[in-house]
């Protein structure tokens, strides 16, 4: 099966729950992890006579997301009913937006591994309400003996971000989702946690002959619950479509469910079109009017976004593109870095970045910590850097101190005192050690006499061992050279 003569065309529909305090149509708490069916009311349950009242904060968050994603904002929009029947939707319809979404014509730029940049267009962002959550007694819907419904999620404000079919590979889809997640997290509209369902993604995919401008038959792929699952699902569907086409067949327009454990997709249902939902304007809500002044007020409240911050880290602090990208990848990492640089001074920015990327991230990976669980404060790191600058500890010992800070939560100065890690900078003490290691290693001494420069560094290493890494390395090299020259004159 050759993929060279085929082109994959991908569009994404990304659902993101907004982090408002309360739901979109009522005063119930918007809270993940509560006991089932505790954050509900007649509006959530669609009881007769219960009417929705718009939580305007959800509108603000939608506009904020749209501006962060370079969208135009619709000043006149409305809500519509999307009609379908499912157990988690007691009203029999979802309040959504059909022909007048709040945001439209946006884009996100992604940078691929080969350094090329691609612009992925965003067709629309509309505001809608989430449904409840089904809990199945079994591994999946088909095998479940019964299902339970938790309506805590019903009425949670949700935005749906729909891309144009601009993506061409699993790699591009993964990069887009990572970038989208970062932008939305920076803008403060959502915690975008896929593991908690606050960011969910459906994939629309088709395959066509390379060079063709016509779209192939589209498959919608659901139940892709992580970025890596999205990429695996796309790769599987791409191969499935190509296999059908090369065998002379034609893929069906259908909705399929991704089963990540088996690495396969299975048929859910034949694909519906928009007319199947019988959209019509929501009669219980007035049209939504947003003034130009309101849009500008929300724009002015946007924080510095990832692309702008990355550029600033490179221009103001001299960080490489890689280092800057790793730091801005998570909002918490960027805030941590900026606070540390503020404490240490701009001249220490590269040093802070090195410690953050090489040591802090290492420890966090080893311990399985997320960006909300940074185990060392900027104050602790800067305190340790000052001890290095003052000559109190060596760079090598600093790594030990850093690990101790992670383990104990103590500051560097306390750890150095308690562990006896102060740098040995006494010339007399170090010269005595240097003379001893030179005298007791005649073979290495002869190598040095023969012009092998690495022999001197070997002796420095022996001094570092004797002092448990506490010797000043520059002083150690100077005194090793002195001891070698003394030995050569004997």
UniProtKB/Swiss-Prot annotation:
Belongs to the GatB/GatE family. GatB subfamily. The keyword Ligase applies. Allows the formation of correctly charged Asn-tRNA(Asn) or Gln-tRNA(Gln) through the transamidation of misacylated Asp-tRNA(Asn) or Glu-tRNA(Gln) in organisms which lack either or both of asparaginyl-tRNA or glutaminyl-tRNA synthetases. The reaction takes place in the presence of glutamine and ATP through an activated phospho-Asp-tRNA(Asn) or phospho-Glu-tRNA(Gln). Keywords: ATP-binding, Ligase, Nucleotide-binding, Protein biosynthesis. Its EC number is 6.3.5.-. PANTHER family: GLUTAMYL-TRNA GLN AMIDOTRANSFERASE SUBUNIT B MITOCHONDRIAL AND PROKARYOTIC PET112-RELATED, GLUTAMYL-TRNA(GLN) AMIDOTRANSFERASE SUBUNIT B, MITOCHONDRIAL. One of its GO terms (molecular function) is ATP binding. Heterotrimer of A, B and C subunits. This is Aspartyl/glutamyl-tRNA(Asn/Gln) amidotransferase subunit B. Pfam families: GatB_N, GatB_Yqey. It comes from the Bacteria. The keyword Hydrolase does not apply. GO terms for biological process: glutaminyl-tRNAGln biosynthesis via transamidation; translation. It is an enzyme of class 6 (ligase). It catalyses: L-glutamyl-tRNA(Gln) + L-glutamine + ATP + H2O = L-glutaminyl-tRNA(Gln) + L-glutamate + ADP + phosphate + H(+); L-aspartyl-tRNA(Asn) + L-glutamine + ATP + H2O = L-asparaginyl-tRNA(Asn) + L-glutamate + ADP + phosphate + 2 H(+). InterPro entries: Asn/Gln-tRNA_amidoTrfase_suB/E, Asn/Gln-tRNA_Trfase_suB/E_cat, Asn/Gln_amidotransferase, Asn/Gln_tRNA_amidoTrase-B-like, GatB, GatB_C_1, GatB_Yqey_C_2, Gln-tRNA_amidoTrfase_suB_CS.
């Amino acid at each position: 099966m050759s993929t060279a003569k085929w082109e994959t065309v991908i569009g994404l529909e990304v659902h993101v729950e907004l982090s408002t305090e309360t739901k979109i149509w009522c005063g119930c708490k918007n809270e993940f992890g509560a006991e089932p069916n505790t954050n509900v009311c007649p509006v959530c349950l669609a009881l007769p006579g219960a009417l929705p009242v718009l939580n305007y904060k959800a509108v603000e968050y939608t506009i904020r997301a749209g501006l962060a994603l370079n969208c135009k904002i619709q000043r006149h929009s409305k809500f519509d009913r999307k009609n379908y029947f499912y157990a988690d939707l007691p009203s029999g319809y979802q309040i959504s937006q059909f022909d007048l979404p709040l945001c439209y014509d946006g884009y996100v730029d992604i940078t691929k591994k080969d350094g090329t940049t691609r612009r992925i267009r965003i067709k629309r962002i509309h505001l809608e309400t989430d449904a409840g959550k089904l809990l199945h007694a079994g591994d999946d819907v088909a095998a479940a003996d019964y299902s339970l419904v938790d309506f805590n999620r019903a009425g949670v404000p949700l935005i749906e971000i729909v891309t144009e079919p601009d993506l061409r590979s699993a790699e591009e889809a993964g990069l887009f989702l990572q970038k989208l997640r970062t932008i939305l997290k920076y803008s403060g509209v959502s915690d975008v946690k896929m593991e908690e369902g606050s960011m969910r993604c459906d994939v629309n995919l088709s395959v066509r002959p390379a060079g063709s401008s016509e779209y192939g038959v589209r498959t919608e792929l659901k139940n892709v619950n992580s970025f890596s699952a999205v990429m695996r699902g796309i790769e599987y569907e791409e191969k499935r479509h190509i296999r059908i086409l090369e065998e002379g067949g034609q893929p069906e327009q259908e909705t399929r469910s991704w089963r990540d454990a088996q690495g396969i997709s299975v048929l859910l249902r034949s694909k519906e079109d928009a007319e199947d939902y019988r959209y019509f304007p929501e009669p219980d809500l007035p049209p939504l009017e947003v003034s130009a002044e309101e849009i500008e007020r929300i724009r002015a409240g946007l924080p510095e976004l990832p692309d702008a911050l990355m550029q600033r880290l490179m221009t103001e602090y001299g960080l490489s593109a890689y280092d800057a990208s790793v730091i801005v990848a998570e909002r918490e990492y960027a805030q941590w870095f900026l606070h540390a640089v503020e404490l240490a001074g701009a001249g220490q920015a590269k040093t802070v970045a090195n410690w953050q990327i090489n040591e802090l991230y290492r420890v966090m990976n080893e311990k399985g910590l997320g960006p909300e669980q940074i185990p060392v404060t900027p104050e602790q790191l800067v305190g340790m850097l000052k001890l290095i600058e003052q000559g109190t500890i060596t760079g090598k010992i600093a790594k030990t101190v850093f690990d101790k800070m992670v383990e104990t939560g103590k500051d560097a100065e306390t750890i150095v005192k308690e562990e006896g890690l102060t740098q040995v900078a006494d010339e007399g003490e170090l010269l005595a050690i240097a003379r001893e290691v030179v005298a007791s290693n005649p073979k290495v001494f002869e190598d040095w006499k023969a012009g092998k420069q690495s022999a001197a560094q070997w002796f420095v290493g022996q001094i570092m061992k004797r002092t448990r890494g506490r010797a000043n390395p520059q002083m150690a090299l100077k005194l090793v050279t002195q001891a070698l020259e003394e030995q050569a004159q004997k």
